[in-house]
Amino acid sequence: MPNTPGTASTSTTLGAPTRIVILGGGFGGVILTRRLESLVGARRDVEIVLVSRDNFFLITPLLFEACSGTLELRHCSQPIRPFLKHARFIEATAHAIDLERRTVSLTVSEGTVQDLPYDHLVLALGAKTNERLIPGSSQAFTFKTVADAIVLRNHLIERFERADVETDPVKKRRLLTVVVIGAGLVGTELVGELTAFVDEIVRWYRTIR
């Protein structure tokens, strides 16, 4: 969101640097910050600020392997600060944007609210699942975070444990049925990793074949 022609900068001090605020610490936000750093360098007339609710960068393509257990969860994320050479990082959640005042309201540690002025604002907050498109999908699992991968993995193991002692073949099959909604990159990669995961653990359950 750049300044419009004839609009003054939000900088309150004469000669203060132009501030570029980037909201979102995912691929888009981090890569853009790195790119701007390479363009701006050590110039003092430009300040780059990256804001994210997490102080780590999640490598989402590795979540599939973390869910199946072929990769340790700690390898799925890296601290954000070491990625940055000149940019400032703020761990906070953005909850409001004032376009007239050119400020972003941030909730930082312990619920403290602060206003961050900007000259240029970039939104790189990623996507959110729209559960209203498919009735009942709010009861399904999502797959976007490390926590999601852990929950899904534990749920699958719990289902295998229940199926192992279930004598009714219909109920057993239902316990072992997994439906993945979405055939894009996430859906297809997840199905592949889950298949490998099931092939690996099924040999430990004597009543499941």
Residue spans of the language-model regions?
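FAD-binding core/adjacent interface of flavoenzyme oxidoreductases
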Residues: 2-17, 88-179, 197, 202
